Amino acid sequence: LVNKHAKGTTMVPIVTQGSVENPRLVNSKEVDVGITNNNLSVLANKGVGPYKKIGAMELRALGSLHFSVLHMMTLDSSSISSVADLEGKRIAVGPAGGGTIPFLKQVLGLADLTIDDLTPSLLAYSDGFSQLADDNVDAAFALSGYPAGAVMQAKANKKLKFIAMTPEQVEIALGKYSNYNK
């Protein structure tokens, strides 16, 4: 659309390592525009999380694609019902370089857990939710628009349920992380 409607402007899509890398690419001027999600842009501008080594960036938003929702799902028959219940479990945490992992680290911290307390599998969302439906992982996560296509596909074959944060965890997250909202 840009190439067709914005005279003198050309855009060429390139494959990157994902929404975690894209702010770094824009900051280093390797690319002019990159796509990421709200929580990662907040972390990048503050220079925290995956951007701690680089430091604060001065990124600007051109627009919004959709709200990102962290889908934390397990089989309806699972004993997992809270973030704390994830300890020691096999979790599909999304693809390497994707936006789920930094967000997941924040959520786990609210239950005094780290990613080291899980057995993480770095899988594309569709593969992770397929593995959940096949009972090869205990839970699967996807940071995407709602509803996530991978969730809908798995839900067609298995009954799923959300893994909830406690009301206290939600209030702490809202106060601690500016990238959270109700």
Place the predicted regions along the sequence by residue.
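Pocket-lining segment of extracytoplasmic ligand-binding domains
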Residues: 49, 115-182
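Conserved residues at beta->alpha junctions
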Residues: 17, 95, 141
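Loop/turn elements at helix/coil->beta-strand transitions in domains of secreted/extracellular proteins
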Residues: 7-9, 30-32, 57-58, 88-89, ...
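A structural signal for short loop-to-beta-strand junctions that line the ligand-binding cleft
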Residues: 52-65
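Solvent-exposed coil/turn segments that connect beta secondary-structure elements
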Residues: 31, 38-41, 67, 75-78, ...
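Bilobed "Venus flytrap"/periplasmic-binding protein-like clamshell domains
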Residues: 1-13, 64-134
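Pocket-flanking alpha-helical
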Residues: 12-53, 126-131, 147-155
